[in-house]
Amino acid sequence: MTTIAPEQLTLNLTPLVEPIYETGMTLEERFEAFHAANPHVADALESLAAQWLSRHRKVGVKSLGETLRWASGIQTDGDPYRINNSYLSRYARLLIERHPEWADSIETRSLATERAA
């Protein structure tokens, strides 16, 4: 059986702040509001990605999001993180923006807004 060292999943699990979304906001605008209110989510996803990519070639941001939800449910007394699945594609792009060297390791697909243009 493999054990996980405690430092491997040490994350900043500050409680989420639910921003106020105005009627008619686009998905991108809602993501930007969520990210502005919760920058620690991107930092935690970045930490998880770095840990994974130190041992593997590819990582799925959906898996990182699920891991973050799980860790927040295990490591805190509050509710597990509730992150809109639609935001994960934006987080993938944000991680690549922060770490261009990860571009070949994180799969992205065109966004609906890109296909509509």
Question: Predicted segments — roles?
Answer:
Residues 1, 36, 40, 55-59, ...:
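Generic ordered-secondary-structure signal
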Residues 2-42:
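Intrinsically disordered, low-complexity serine/threonine- and proline-rich regulatory segments
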Residues 5-10, 89-117:
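C-terminal engagement modules used by replication, chromatin/transcription, nuclear envelope/ESCRT
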Residues 20, 30-33, 51, 86, ...:
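Intrinsically disordered, low-complexity N-terminal regions enriched in serine/proline/glycine
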Residues 21-24, 54, 81, 85:
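Homeobox/homeodomain signature
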Residues 26-75:
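Positively charged, polyanion-binding regions of nucleic-acid-associated proteins
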Residues 45-48, 59, 78, 82, ...:
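General "foldedness" signal
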Residues 62-104:
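Charge-enriched amphipathic alpha-helical scaffolds
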